[in-house]
From Swiss-Prot:
InterPro entries: Ribosomal_uL4 (IPR002136), Ribosomal_uL4-like (IPR013005), Ribosomal_uL4_dom_sf (IPR023574)
One Gene Ontology term of the molecular function aspect: rRNA binding
Positions of region (Disordered): 44-76
Protein name (database record): Large ribosomal subunit protein uL4
GO terms under cellular component: ribonucleoprotein complex; ribosome
NCBIfam families from the UniProt entry: rplD_bact
Protein family (similarity comment): Belongs to the universal ribosomal protein uL4 family.
Annotated gene: rplD
Keywords, ordered alphabetically: Ribonucleoprotein, Ribosomal protein, RNA-binding, rRNA-binding
Oxidoreductase recorded as keyword: no
Length: 204
């Protein structure tokens, strides 16, 4: 697959051959869904927690006698049927993450890359650097027509990352951080030359 290389100034910088085993695979939505669910599960903080019947503050005294009142028998005001009672089988602090085979994760990333290429939403960029001001970055990105873009670079240039930090829906990640969720969550996928080499090594 031959792809034209663009520059940040919307110019041309030659072409590059993209490996078909990474960018021309038939996308599988089931695999990508599994990887996205796995990613989102690992991102969850898991700090949710409720108090059970034994943890609620308050008296443990029986509210009234067992018989003769005409009301249903009650043994504690901490019981879950009361407004101030404990919660039955409530959430506890836990890790929501689970294991996903490395082969599935690798295939999911390849499918996401191939889907962007098939949709014509993959752009190869010469380099993502040389921009230090947000105004300058915004002008260049507007000229390129990107409204939602993920830029994957070999090693993220700090000045460039700061310049685009306040631009909505424009993000940059190093090759090692490229993932299915962020790729699918952006309209355009932009890969630099260095990022392309890094992806080849990572997915070899």
């Amino acid at each position: 697959m031959e792809y034209d290389i663009k520059t940040l100034d919307n110019g041309s910088a030659g072409s590059v051959a993209l490996p078909e085993e990474i960018f021309a695979v038939t996308p599988r939505s089931d695999i990508m869904a599994r990887v996205v669910h796995w990613q989102l599960a690992k991102r969850r903080a898991g700090t949710h927690r409720t108090k059970g019947m034994g943890e609620i503050s308050g008296t443990t005294k029986k509210p009234y006698r067992q018989k003769g009142t005409g009301s249903a028998r009650q043994g504690s005001l901490r019981a879950p049927q009361f407004r101030t009672g404990g919660v039955v089988h409530g959430p506890v602090v836990r890790d929501h993450g689970y294991d996903l085979p490395k082969k599935v994760r690798r295939l999911g990333l390849i499918c996401a890359l191939s889907q962007k290429a098939a949709e014509g939403k993959l752009i190869v960029l010469d380099a993502a650097n040389g921009v230090t001001k947000t105004r300058e970055a915004a002008a260049k990105i507007k000229a390129l027509g990107w409204t939602s873009a993920l830029i994957v670079d070999g090693a993220v240039d700090e000045q460039f990352a700061r310049a685009i930090a306040n631009l909505p829906k424009i993000d940059v990640l190093p090759t090692i951080g490229a993932n299915v969720y962020d790729i699918l969550n952006h309209d355009v996928l932009v890969i630099t030359r260095a990022g392309l080499e890094g992806l080849k090594e990572r997915l070899a």
